[in-house]
């Protein structure tokens, strides 16, 4: 009798679990299955895009290629800020690099600088909830932290709309924008796994309305003040907890040590010799609501590439396209003689969904006319950049996949500058020298004599399972 009762309880629990799972899945699929088309408004705005103009008040810029430099330049901006710091990031962890950024922000807040931090509401639920390091920052009187679209299982129709932006603004004059999240994979040189990515540092000492730093600041204010952004533990009494006090002390000590080791570079506020002049920098962004989005960034980047004179080179960690996206590439290939893309090989891809979809659809991608180079560097490549002719460079957070096109907020900078274009080309070539060109039929052109990463049996099984069990949901990954 007792055994029968236990079985009945277990069946009820299982039934409840299956009902909840079905509710979540149905809510997500119904909300995000339909993919909006490009509006006439977007087409008109793209035709008259700001990247076609030249700015009278030019901004200076430089690309940040290496992870240690990316950490140092962030700390440098924070340390020298006098009034306000804005940090927006998809993911923020309290590992070594994350603690250094937290320590730098806490130090700035102690100096009276106003800090506003915006983090995606799904990633923050995993990394920030119950974490004394983040409570130590959120409880500071000069700090505000908000979460974009907090995870809410009761509203699955909002679940997949994530904030994928990554940027840091100091005093409304200088900023870093790119594809790096705020933890060890992307910042510093700490033991363990790494991802290779790319940022741009932009400097404008006397910004005017037309400048990209003001475009970015206005974008931030819009997303900060809209209904989907809510506060993260802003109770100042949290600072009295012993665990929080200990965490703050650890942050202060760790940051002070890093600062002393890099004091000369961090305190240098003259960026002239390390940056390049630009003719124009323009910000391209997706809609910021949590539903299925109009593919604004995809369309605008596509139109830019179609107008190239002779060269388009794309770097992306993942390729997951629908027919509309494939058609865009076919049009580019018809117009541009040198059209190529570099992405992670199936074995080198850190994202199992990206690896599985690429393995299945590689021939379809090749049929568009684009040349594919597969990166075999050992660590997953995460850079999201486009090189157009010898004067345009595009860098930011946008992956060449349906998630970036239709689901996430995304930012890309379009930079008109031959110097930046040359710097980007050199950075791209570093990775391309560890890649092979895949040809139709599965053979390779291997001019750099690259040793490919082994595709293990375990990874093959994982890819097989993803393709056959989750392939129907590829628009969500």
Label every PLM stretch briefly:
Residues 2-143, 153-164, 170, 174-477:
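Charged, low-complexity intrinsically disordered terminal segments
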Residues 146:
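Phosphate-binding P-loop/Walker A region and its immediate neighborhood
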